[in-house]
Amino acid sequence: MKFFFFSFINYKVLNDAARPWQIGFQDPATPIMEGIVNLHHDIIFFLIIIIIFVSWILFRTLFLFNSKTNPVAYNFSHGTFIELLWTLTPSLVLIGIAVPSFALLYSIDEIIDPAITIKAVGRQWYWSYEYSDYVNEENEFLAFHSYILPEEDLELGQFRLLEVDNRIIIPVNTHIRIIVTGADVIHSWAVPSLGVKCDAIPGRLNQISFFIKREGIYYGQCSEICGVNHGFMPIVIEAVSFDDYIRWVQNKILD
């Protein structure tokens, strides 16, 4: 009983990271992820109805049209109405699923007036970040590397294989653009609770955007097999208030 109680408490506090035996989504922190979760629920609704209907037809056919009940088979060559029905009905269902998914796909690719642009570079096996909107007195961009935190350096409550030495700090309620590329092999920058995943390809710049609605710490990982230490490339985003973000930028520039 204690285990389940504390698991529930941890779930409510640490709802922006994966938890043991999780089969659902992490709590959405962006409108995009909310749309993905809602689309999933809508599709599951249609899926349950289809499964129930098809199962009912299947069992009805097995019990009412077997060799004992109907020793002589009916001689049907075709049925125009039923053929139209089983062609049009799935088409309408697919259209009903496709229309909202197209709108969601379009909104994912839309870049809305980003206030902050961050460049993420995938390397074997760590991430580098560059805040190109800010420069110090020596005309250098605000930039840093982000390595996985060794297990012996973890503090109580921190996650093994998910913590880093330098987090990405961004403000809430702000349109953020991430430009993603790779320095050596193909990586993938992904944060599930934000609903973002973007391939980091050497020689190519890809971009994604998001709008975080609440403060918190969001965890992700490289999602493209990139070598022996692929599993040691975590991503940690800390969303803070705008005032805290400005203070962090000032301290970083002074450093």
From Swiss-Prot:
Predominant location: mitochondrion
Side Mitochondrial matrix, residues: 64-83
Transmembrane segments: 43-63, 84-104
UniProt KW keywords: Copper, Electron transport, Magnesium, Membrane, Metal-binding, Mitochondrion, Mitochondrion inner membrane, Respiratory chain, Translocase, Transmembrane, Transmembrane helix, Transport
Catalytic activity: 4 Fe(II)-[cytochrome c] + O2 + 8 H(+)(in) = 4 Fe(III)-[cytochrome c] + 2 H2O + 4 H(+)(out)
Mitochondrial intermembrane side: 1-42, 105-255
Pfam families associated with the record: COX2 (PF00116), COX2_TM (PF02790)
Cofactor(s) needed by this chain: Cu cation
An annotated Gene Ontology molecular function: cytochrome-c oxidase activity
Subcellular location: Mitochondrion inner membrane
InterPro entries: CcO_II, CcO_II-like_C, CcO_II_C, Copper_CuA, Cupredoxin, Cyt_c_oxidase_su2, Cyt_c_oxidase_su2_TM_dom, Cyt_c_oxidase_su2_TM_sf
SUPFAM superfamilies xrefs: Cupredoxins, Cytochrome c oxidase subunit II-like, transmembrane region
A GO CC term attached to the entry: mitochondrial inner membrane
List of residues binding Mg(2+): 224
Domain of life: Eukaryota
Cofactor annotation comment: Binds a dinuclear copper A center per subunit.
GO biological process, one term: ATP synthesis coupled electron transport
Residues where Cu cation A2 binds: 222, 224, 226, 230
This enzyme's EC code(s): 7.1.1.9
Family as reported in the entry's similarity comment: Belongs to the cytochrome c oxidase subunit 2 family.
Self-association state and partner proteins as the record states: Component of the cytochrome c oxidase (complex IV, CIV), a multisubunit enzyme composed of a catalytic core of 3 subunits and several supernumerary subunits. The complex exists as a monomer or a dimer and forms supercomplexes (SCs) in the inner mitochondrial membrane with ubiquinol-cytochrome c oxidoreductase (cytochrome b-c1 complex, complex III, CIII).
Protein name: Cytochrome c oxidase subunit 2
Species the sequence originates in: Cyanidium caldarium (Red alga)
Highest classification ranks of the organism: Eukaryota, Rhodophyta, Bangiophyceae, Cyanidiales, Cyanidiaceae
